C-alpha cells in the first residue's frame, strides 16, 4: 500500500436515535463557531436553549429514517468509500465526519500511524460555505499542527459547476426526470444571510437577487454559497433541457428567527401546491448523500405539506450516494485536486 490516502469527509450523524446521543451530536454541531457565528457566551446560551426541546424532536425525526445498518448518511458514505477503493490506487480510502464518529482528528491520527504521509482531503460539499468546507479544512489543519502529524494535505475544492459533477447529477436523476412531472424543485440547504454578508468584499452585494453573484468578481463568486447553488441549478436544468418555468430553486432547514437566504423551501412547497402543481420532483443538490434533511425533512414532512397545499405527489429524487457515475467523477476530481 502506498502512502497517499483519500479522506472523504461528510457532516456527521448521532451515534443512535436516543435523545442522549442526539443531544450530544447537536451540541457539538451547534457549538461550532462556523455554524453559529456568535461570540462564545451568546452561542453557549443559545445552544443551551435549543437543547431543551430539540434533541427529543430530532431523535423522533432520526428514528423515522434510521436504517437497520445505522444512520443513512454514514451508511451511504461508507458505501461510497467502498466503491472508491478501486478508483484510488495510491493508498487507503477512509471516511470521517466533522461531527460524531468516525471523528476527523482520530482518523487523521490513525492514517499517520499507518505510515500515510499525504492526504487528499475531500469535503463532500459541492458548494462553498464556512459552515461546511471551512470548518472541515480548519479542523484538519489544526489537528495536523497540534498533534504533530507528518501529513501533507491537499484539498478538493468546491465543484458546484464542474461539468462532470453536473453530468453525474444528470445521470442519477435522469430516470426520474424521464417520467411525467409538473415541476422540479431544487432545494438546497439554507444559511443565515449574515454568513454570506461577512464574506462579501464589497459590502453591498444583493443576496436576494435572482442572479445573485453571477456578474460579481471571481473573489465573490468563490465564496457566495447562494450564487453557487443557483449556478448548480441552472447548469443542471440546461444539461437536462428543462424549460424555464418548470424548475425553481429554494433553501431549506432554516433554524431560528434570523434572516436566511431565500426563497424558503417551506414557502415554495405551499406556493407550488396552491398553484396547481400535482406531481412535484424535489432534488437536494447540496447533499451528496441522503440524510435527515432529504429523507425526513423533504421526503416526509415536505411531502405532507405539499399534499396539504393541494398537490398530489412529491417525489424525492435520491442524492448521488454511490451512483457509479458519481464514483467515477469524484475519483477523477480527487486525482486532480
Swiss-Prot record:
Among InterPro entries, the record links this protein to: Ferrochelatase, Ferrochelatase_C, Ferrochelatase_N
Task: List the GO biological process terms.
Answer: heme biosynthetic process
UniProt pathway: Porphyrin-containing compound metabolism; protoheme biosynthesis; protoheme from protoporphyrin-IX: step 1/1
What intrachain disulfides are recorded? none
* Residues the entry annotates as binding Fe cation: 189, 293
Catalyzed chemical reaction(s)? heme b + 2 H(+) = protoporphyrin IX + Fe(2+)
Against Pfam families, the record matches this protein to: Ferrochelatase (PF00762)
Coiled coil ranges (UniProt) are none
Query: What's the superkingdom here?
Result: Bacteria
Q: Where in the cell is the protein located?
A: Cytoplasm
E.C. number(s) listed in UniProt: 4.98.1.1
Query: What keyword terms does UniProt attach to this protein?
Result: Cytoplasm, Heme biosynthesis, Iron, Lyase, Metal-binding, Porphyrin biosynthesis
An annotated GO cellular component: cytoplasm
Can you name one GO molecular function term for this protein?
metal ion binding
Output the Gene3D superfamilies linked to this UniProt entry.
3.40.50.1400
What does the sequence similarity comment in the record state about its family?
Belongs to the ferrochelatase family.
Query: What job does this protein perform?
Result: Catalyzes the ferrous insertion into protoporphyrin IX.
Protein name per UniProt: Ferrochelatase
Q: What organism is recorded for this protein?
A: Pseudomonas putida (strain GB-1)
Q: Which gene encodes it?
A: hemH
Amino acid at each position: 500500500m502506498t502512502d497517499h490516502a483519500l479522506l472523504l469527509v461528510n457532516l456527521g450523524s448521532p451515534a443512535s436515535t436516543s435523545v442522549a446521543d442526539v443531544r450530544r451530536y447537536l451540541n457539538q454541531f451547534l457549538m461550532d463557531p462556523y455554524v453559529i457565528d456568535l461570540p462564545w457566551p451568546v452561542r453557549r446560551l443559545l445552544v443551551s436553549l435549543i437543547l431543551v426541546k430539540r434533541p427529543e424532536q430530532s431523535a423522533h425525526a432520526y428514528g423515522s429514517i434510521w436504517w437497520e445498518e445505522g444512520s443513512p448518511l454514514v451508511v451511504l458514505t461508507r458505501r461510497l468509500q467502498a466503491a472508491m477503493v478501486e478508483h484510488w490506487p495510491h493508498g487507503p480510502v477512509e471516511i470521517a465526519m466533522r461531527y460524531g464518529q468516525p471523528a476527523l482528528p482520530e482518523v487523521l491520527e490513525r492514517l499517520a500511524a499507518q505510515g500515510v504521509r499525504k492526504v487528499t482531503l475531500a469535503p463532500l460539499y459541492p458548494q462553498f460555505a464556512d459552515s461546511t468546507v471551512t470548518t472541515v479544512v480548519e479542523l484538519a489543519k489544526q489537528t495536523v499542527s497540534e498533534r504533530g502529524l507528518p501529513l501533507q494535505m491537499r484539498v478538493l475544492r468546491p465543484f458546484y459547476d464542474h461539468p462532470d459533477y453536473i453530468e453525474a447529477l444528470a445521470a442519477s436523476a435522469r430516470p426520474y426526470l424521464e417520467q411525467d412531472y409538473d415541476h422540479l424543485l431544487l432545494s438546497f440547504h439554507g444559511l443565515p444571510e449574515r454568513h454570506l454578508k461577512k464574506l462579501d468584499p464589497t459590502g453591498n452585494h444583493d443576496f436576494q437577487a435572482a442572479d445573485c453573484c453571477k456578474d460579481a468578481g471571481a473573489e465573490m463568486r468563490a465564496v457566495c454559497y447562494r450564487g453557487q447553488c443557483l449556478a448548480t441549478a441552472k447548469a443542471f436544468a440546461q444539461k437536462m433541457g428543462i424549460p424555464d418555468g418548470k424548475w425553481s430553486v429554494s433553501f431549506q432547514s432554516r433554524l431560528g428567527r434570523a434572516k436566511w437566504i431565500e426563497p424558503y423551501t417551506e414557502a415554495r412547497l405551499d406556493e407550488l401546491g396552491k398553484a396547481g402543481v400535482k406531481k412535484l420532483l424535489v432534488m437536494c443538490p447540496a447533499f451528496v448523500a441522503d440524510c435527515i434533511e432529504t429523507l425526513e425533512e423533504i421526503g416526509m414532512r415536505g411531502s405532507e405539506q405539499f399534499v396539504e397545499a393541494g398537490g398530489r405527489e412529491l417525489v424525492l429524487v435520491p442524492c448521488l450516494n454511490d451512483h457509479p457515475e458519481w464514483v467515477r467523477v469524484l475519483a477523477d476530481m480527487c486525482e486532480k485536486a
